[in-house]
């Protein structure tokens, strides 16, 4: 994931005096090329083009059923992507007819990408010049094991470019879990029952798989940023690689199991899958109603109660879509302004993976014993074992990340080993000592990443 700015190591920053706490003055932020925006736009255009191509092929072959579902998944995710970009950029309150028209014809990500490129070129030409409009941003940072508070100036142009990046991160998650996941699952199902994989369908499945993996990786990064909003977080290549491997194994094994289960039971599998999704969808609302809390009214200052309700419903649908295929890396909390529980939530993570593992084992057993007509030329037992092993490996890689590679693992009250000791050895969890300086709060916690 590319960064908007970078903070150098401790010797390059200058401490300044403060009556309340020591603040280190950071250098002027350095902007980088927005690769993530280009990549997200490429995935959107590639998946859209391949989906429309398959719709044309299905229509030509009079396969109306397959054509309808392929087009429906494409349209739903595309509309949600346009609404996400409009919401983040607040276009409804601005006079921007060209942007709204491009969103209307489902080309909003393309025009937004061009705007971001123009903004980057403008910054590149003005590099070294001071901007007249700047704001101060403060973040905590761990340097050599010590927690320090860093302050730096952020120009208006860099903040605008950062807003584009944030919008595309959220767009990629919407596209991944509300469009690519159902599209990939359905195309796998069609390939399985038709016993053929034409080039167009293979390209569509490839774009969908890359989109899902990228969206899940971003989901982890955004979860870390939201939970530790006061901290400047760095994720190195090894951490990103670990997250990508974890998510790829988790999602592919889960989706293949769902496809084999659906191909085995046909329509009989629909009630199980729908019930599974509805439980995830209504679980945050049940907790919200049981808590007796009021609906948050400060999500967006210009929103009415109806607008707030629409946002909450949309977020809940996205949350359910993520948890249906993989772990969301955060727990939804509708009564909170940030809509997420910022605790570590080891229990929530353990419950999710335990339930999903049991579900996967049950679906694999159904495929093994009843899927005689699905894959006649393959050993069902070998396929079942490989899928379960792949899912277990993904859990192992996830535990490895939280134990050794999490950027702020030193702030954990308990880590993975503590919980394994508690569960396996039946011993009380040893409480790790928190950093004594974590109570130091920044005056300004506005985040631009």
Swiss-Prot record:
Recorded superkingdom: Eukaryota
GO cellular component: plasma membrane
Keywords, alphabetical: Membrane, Transmembrane, Transmembrane helix
InterPro entries given in the database record: XK-rel, XK-related_adapter
Subcellular location: Membrane
Parts of the chain that traverse the membrane: 35-55, 68-88, 98-118, 174-194, 204-224, 241-261, 269-289, 306-326, 357-377, 382-402
Bilayer topology: Multi-pass membrane protein
Family: Belongs to the XK family.
PANTHER family from the UniProt entry: MEMBRANE TRANSPORT PROTEIN XK FAMILY MEMBER, XK-RELATED PROTEIN 2
Protein name per Swiss-Prot or TrEMBL: XK-related protein 2
